């Protein structure tokens, strides 16, 4: 791949638009570094709008350098499609961790849940405050904060990933008014209404994630996408203390 700079080891995950591989960055004298490689699926490589979004993600990621955000290392093209080379996080995403714990009949422990949320918020705060080379605010909004996009390494590092739906002032591809982006269950009410969003939408989504970690159940999940969106718009949040007595009053107020 890409003039032998990268070697694919195994496929890690695949979605409807891209697939992610574990790979190695190769260089002189046997140099090798483990990386993650996100590749556009071949049938989308000729879709100009999607490629524009993919390149926006790469450019935006390359600007960011923070311990709680997955680093973008390179971008390239091979086999008639594009790929992004990213920092490899040896661990699991939060969705997988929550699902494993739920099978055991327990939520994420309180201390760990708060730690994960705080670390993810540090990464988001950095992104929200990022400026361009001239000191102008980039106005970054992730727009897809959810358990699959929060990675936890085996060493306990927490990293936000996948800025593929992010909004920023530098984007080449703009979102049309009224278009909803992000997973329905983690939208802010204004996003569910198709209104413009700012960084508060990310904080709302992070609050949902924290609530779900501690409650051990989903917050906004209907029998259909339509019902889920209606629940988000209503934004009725049940008392966390009533579900998990370990949640103290101060945490309840924050959420």
Task: Give the label of every model feature segment.
Residues 148-151, 161, 185-255:
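C-terminal lobe helix-coil module of Hanks-type protein kinase domains
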Residues 41-63:
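AlphaC helix of the eukaryotic protein kinase fold
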Residues 75:
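Activation-segment/catalytic-loop signature of the eukaryotic protein kinase fold
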Residues 9-16, 20:
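Protein kinase glycine-rich loop
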Residues 79-93, 97:
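Conserved short submotifs of the Hanks-type protein kinase catalytic core
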Residues 45-49, 154-196, 223:
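Activation segment of protein kinases
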Residues 122-140:
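Protein kinase catalytic-loop region centered on the HRD/HxD motif
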